[in-house]
Amino acid sequence: MVPLSVLDLSPVTSGSSGTQALRNSLDLAELADRLGYTRYWLAEHHNLASIASAAPEIMIGQIAARTRRLRVGSGGVMLPNHAPLMVAERFKVLEALFPGRIDLGIGRAPGTDPVTSLALRMRQQGSADDDFLERLQELLLLETRGYPEGHPFRNVQAMPST
């Protein structure tokens, strides 16, 4: 028999929410595990109202905790959006918690539009505390959608929308 896998973007259906899309993904993974699927992949996309899959490593942990034998992985983590050390550490933690069941798939595409890509990658360089207050303010603005009119990140939204 050919091994079967699922690639899940956690789609947000019309009239639903990102929260429900994530719950649907958890349910689908449990079903895939019961049906004998081999692997469950989670995608990384940002600032898309129709896709709730912005943080695959968090969902990987949730799915691995709710299933018994299914391998769970990222399909994929968009490496340009992350510090490689952080990716390695996150997946090593997942592997320590769920030995032999975690897969790391990586990609090079941004997984988003150019403006959101800029928001994801800005200030990845510099010293640890040079711009802490600026980063804190940016985090608050993203959480509250508080960028002023005309700001390039005005339409960038932390997903999923709940």
Describe the residue ranges of each PLM region.
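N-terminal beta1-alpha1-beta2 module of alpha/beta enzyme domains
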Residues: 1-67
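Flexible, glycine-rich active-site loops centered on histidine and acidic residues
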Residues: 3, 7-18, 80-147
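Hydrophobic faces of well-ordered beta-strands that scaffold small-molecule active sites
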Residues: 4-8, 40-42, 72-75, 102-106, ...
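Acidic-and-aromatic substrate-binding clefts and catalytic sites of carbohydrate-active enzymes
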Residues: 46-54, 80-85, 159
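Glycine-rich, flexible loop/turn motifs
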Residues: 66, 75, 114-118, 152
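Glycine-enriched alpha-helix->loop->beta-strand junction motifs that scaffold or abut catalytic
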Residues: 66-69, 98
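Short mixed-charge
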Residues: 148-154
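Short, intrinsically disordered, charge-balanced linker/junction segments flanking boundaries
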Residues: 155-162
